[in-house]
Amino acid sequence: MKFASLLLASAVMLISCDKTGGDDTGLDAGFQISSNKNVIQSNGADAVTFTAELDGKDVTAETTFYLKDSMTPLDGNKLTADKVGVYHVIGMYGTFYTEEPIAVTAIDMEVPAPAEDPAASNTSFVHRAFLNQYTGTGCGYCPGMVSALRAAFEDEETKNMAVHAAVHSYNAGDPAYIGAPKASGYPYMEIDMAVSFSYDLDPDAKAGVLKKALSERVSVPAKVGISANPISKDDVLVVTVEVKAAEDGEYNLGVWFLQDNVYGQQTDYLGIADNSYNYHENCVRSADSRFGSSFAGHPLGQIKKGETAQRTFVLNIDREAWKLKDLNDLHFAAFVTAKNGRNYNVVNVVDCKISEPTPYQYK
């Protein structure tokens, strides 16, 4: 059975807004529920455990947890499943309740463990920046931005500093179209949800600016490392991502699933696009990172230096809609954000294959 990627973190509030880094509006609530996992095996034994807090006080014992669709109470604070599907759980404590449920996905295969850590005591990680390109096949000025990116990436050292994701959210007729996140204007580029660039007429100058910005972002030590372990069955991809902290902090985790070799005729007002511009790489097919009003990732909570936290993500691979001929054209970017003022910025990212584990990348 196939599933949509509907894996929301604790007390998620879905708001009609398409920011990436966003701000912290709507993220805090007096009564909140959380879970120790978001994906379980549908064997009737694997269980997810829920907890509840009111203004920071543990009220789990006094909270009743329900399946939202049927308002059936759970047996205590645990949920098991003997059928494949997505289960939505809410909590009620006195007059307090959670408006948005926690989604738990039950799958008919074993949930993958985290990738093996080759150096458990090491916290010195390779640092890469997350470069998000907002373009579309119907955007006539977008080849200028793509040209700047290509020029910047001609330098192998610069290319290795970044993980690139192409967000085709401009026009619905785009074969790689995704409805969100969106940009305020197109073309647009963002690095780590912190530094942004809009269109100008000088791709070579823009390439120089991009190279400088990427170098500055990765010049500081990485606050976290990221590993991933994917498995797949019947076009359902399940990925467990683990985060290890190099610095104490509260972190969020997201995964954007990407596809290469997507063909789409590119509009070009600049007269610079040859046939290669009709083949699009790193196209975002699913941005599983929405929390509150942003796409800054699902909260992992506080992680102390040397400790880890994890989350599992599920993707329904739609070969027909995506015109996907080769599964090797799929990969994913796993990224971590941390709060910076009212915004959330990416503090590290890795590009992962769907066919093998990605261990922590140490310096």
What is each residue range found by the language model?
Residues 1-44, 96-118, 360-363:
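Bacterial Sec-dependent N-terminal signal peptides
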Residues 26-36, 128, 220-226:
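Proline-enriched interdomain boundary motifs that mark the N-terminal boundary
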Residues 77-86:
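Solvent-exposed segments in extracellular or luminal domains encompassing
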